Amino acid sequence: QVNFSPNW
């Protein structure tokens, strides 16, 4: 499971 969620 790969989660890419930038905190911008």
Curated annotation (Swiss-Prot):
Pyrrolidone carboxylic acid: modified positions: 1
UniProt record, GO biological process: neuropeptide signaling pathway
Keywords: Amidation, Hormone, Neuropeptide, Pyrrolidone carboxylic acid, Secreted
GO CC, alphabetical: extracellular region
Locations listed in the record: Secreted
Residues recorded as bearing Tryptophan amide in the entry: 8
GO MF annotations, alphabetized: hormone activity
Family, per entry: Belongs to the AKH/HRTH/RPCH family.
Free-text function comment from the UniProt entry: Hypertrehalosaemic factors are neuropeptides that elevate the level of trehalose in the hemolymph (trehalose is the major carbohydrate in the hemolymph of insects).
UniProt name for this protein: Hypertrehalosaemic factor 1
Taxonomic path: Eukaryota, Metazoa, Ecdysozoa, Arthropoda, Hexapoda
